[in-house]
Amino acid sequence: AIENFYAMDDCMRKILETEYEIDPISDEELFNKTMTHYQTKREEFHQATLMFNAWYACLHEVPSWSHDNVSLSHKFPKSLLNYSIDSPIVASYTILDIEAMYPDAPHIEDDVINIKKTSLSTDLTLNLRGKYEIEFVYKYILFLNKDAGTRSRQYTKKNKNYNFTLDGAVTSMSQYAYIPEDLRHY
């Protein structure tokens, strides 16, 4: 999905440079610290949401599955993972929890889900559900805005805010999105 390109490192680099005025050369230490933090939190998020993403991807491979049985929100289900960038992002749900949320969905065997997890893991940023990826980026930007508003800034250097809504994220961040070569030539 197009939203996945907004979670790429290149997009966050551009946001840090433009919106937060953190220069990768003159502010190298801060820039690298913030990028490393972003990558770490994104990896935590990926690991915490991987099982759900794998389960949902497996549903698409069940011939008898009807989309009416599982309707997903644009946001990751809070009952499965209610996370904050300020603290470790860790999954606390199981397949049984997912099945309880979606009782009309077909049962997927654990080994099938594990195979799908391995398949998705080749590039989590591009392979996981784009709506959840952009939600994570949005939450990370809110985290940066909060950091910028404090006197003891750790990941920003000025009182700068990058404001937009989650619903308007694709439009607001379009100038920063990573665009792969094959899409440029399309």
Q: What are the language-model segments listed below?
A:
Residues 1-186:
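Acidic, divalent-metal-binding catalytic cores of TOPRIM
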